[in-house]
Amino acid sequence: MWGDIDRKFVNSYSDASVNTLTQQFTADIRTFKLDFGAQYTAKLSAKENITLGVTFSPAHKIGGHPELKKILTNSQTSVSDTTSYGGGFDLSLPNTFGVGVMWSHNDKLKLGADYTLQQWANVQFPTFETVSGASTFALRDNQFSDRHKITLGGEYCPSAFSRKFFNRIHYRAGVSYATPYIKVNGNDGPTEISASVGFGVPIINVFNNRSFLNVSAQWAHSSAKNFISENVFRISVGLTFNELWFSKWKLE
């Protein structure tokens, strides 16, 4: 994983004699992320089985060498003063744990539940502070909270190999609840509740029976105490394709 972070905050005033303050936070990420997982399926009966899964992503430093620049400018005098802080420490990713279970009946009905924990409370993040006239930009604790996410979902397909088109469609629905990991002025950020419905249309021919055109609609609501709430509606269209699309015939 790689990328640049560049955030800029500008405080300007209508009075030209007052200095404009620009704060610029930058970091350059060049690192990796490891994900481990295990899965086991147990047969409950001739038509039922249950699948258990666990995942783990270890915490590690991702570099970045974050830097903060404070720039004071005056439009009347054209004088600019820049002070730089930081650059000698690294950002980090948290430990992430996941566990899930899925129950399947006759390859028609599937119900599942997932739980994910991201241990952001153990992650330090750089902040700027001025104490007794001394300004510092350094890594500090208690900048985040642990993030918990619970997801419930299901899928129903009347008959995957039926001659009738609508019997081969996969109908899906799900809900989720997630707590925030960010803090705003020391308060927890917005929690998020979401719900989605959708369907997968199989693309079937003599060479391919595992490709799907997926369409879904999602509603997400985020809110926090003393903050505005937000409602978001999304429409997603995707294609899950079979690797046989890229195969070529070979005659000998």
Predicted segment positions?
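Outer-membrane beta-barrel porins/channels
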Residues: 1-252
